């Protein structure tokens, strides 16, 4: 028998929601409980959650990460929001809960001071969906490097040291600065997946193994991609060139 969800309540998540949120996340995304525990333990420092609740049961959730700041030379910093991990229980899908929690999360993000909101949809088909419900424009350019093995000589980095070096390497380049809690979660995500944050000479990157290869979502400085042999991708020309990024492009960081 189909539930009548018209009386579902949208609200900000509370600490006592942790077990239900963890169960929903694991059921929908299949991630290990350790990863969800790490995320929820850091959430207060990164942002907050939005839930759709019906009769005491959480049927949908979305998270807004507002621990990002857009830095552009000559311009005032902008607080950024990142919509993350939108999930709805299978039995409650098709009735607008995903759109409702996403829209409410975006509004909550603005309430917390975000002047710019972005997201990284899990599937190509979702770009249009997010564009319609949140009035977002598809503007991303993205390359993920991969390699059979990490190069010799890499050294692990703590999140705080990675963040310090990252800021030095991106000085003068339009980029998004994560706060320490966001960087801690990025480190936890990589560590739980079998990887981490690394340095090699003057380069920094984070990486994790996936299906027999090492995935490298971020690699700095911008010229570093041409200095590590074995990357199995056609690197965008400006990543290997000694020249500025194209006008309007911002170096971002996302949770993969």
Model-found features: residue ranges?
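Conserved N-terminal entry element of GNAT/NAT acetyltransferase domains
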Residues: 1-16, 148-159
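Active-site rim helix/loop that mediates acceptor-substrate recognition in acyltransferases
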Residues: 18, 23-73, 171-197
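Conserved beta-strand in the GNAT
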Residues: 51, 57-67, 80-87, 118, ...
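Conserved acetyl-CoA-binding loop-helix of GNAT-fold acetyltransferases
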Residues: 85-88, 94-109, 222-232
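Conserved GNAT acetyl-CoA-binding A-motif
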Residues: 102, 109-122, 232-241
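Long, hydrophobic, well-ordered secondary-structure blocks that form the structural core
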Residues: 105, 114-143
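Active-site/acyl-donor-binding loops of N-acyltransferases
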Residues: 131-153, 211-256
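Amide-forming acyltransferase catalytic core, primarily the GNAT-like/NAT-type
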Residues: 136-217
């Amino acid at each position: 028998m189909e539930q009548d969800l018209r009386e579902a309540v949208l609200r900000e998540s509370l600490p006592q929601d942790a077990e239900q949120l963890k169960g929903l996340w694991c059921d929908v995304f299949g991630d290990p409980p350790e990863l969800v525990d790490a995320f929820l333990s850091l959430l207060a420092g990164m942002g907050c959650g939005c839930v759709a609740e019906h009769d005491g049961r959480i049927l949908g959730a979305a998270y807004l990460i507002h621990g990002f700041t857009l830095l552009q030379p000559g311009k005032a910093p902008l607080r950024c929001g990142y919509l993350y991990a939108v999930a709805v229980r299978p039995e409650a899908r098709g009735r607008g809960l995903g759109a409702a929690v996403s829209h409410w999360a975006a509004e909550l993000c603005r309430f917390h001071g975000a002047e710019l909101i972005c997201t990284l949809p899990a599937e190509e088909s979702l770009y249009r969906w997010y564009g319609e419900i949140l009035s977002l424009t598809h503007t991303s350019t993205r390359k993920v490097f991969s390699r059979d093995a990490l190069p010799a000589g890499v050294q692990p980095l703590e999140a705080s040291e990675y963040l310090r070096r990252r800021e030095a390497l991106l000085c003068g380049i339009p980029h998004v600065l994560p706060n320490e809690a966001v960087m801690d979660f990025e480190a936890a995500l990589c560590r739980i997946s079998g990887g981490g944050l690394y340095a090699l000479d003057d380069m920094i990157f984070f990486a994790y193994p996936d299906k027999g290869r090492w995935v490298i979502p971020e690699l700095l400085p911008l010229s570093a991609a041409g200095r590590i042999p074995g990357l199995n991708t056609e690197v965008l020309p400006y990543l290997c060139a000694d020249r500025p990024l194209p006008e309007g492009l911002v170096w971002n960081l996302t949770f993969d």
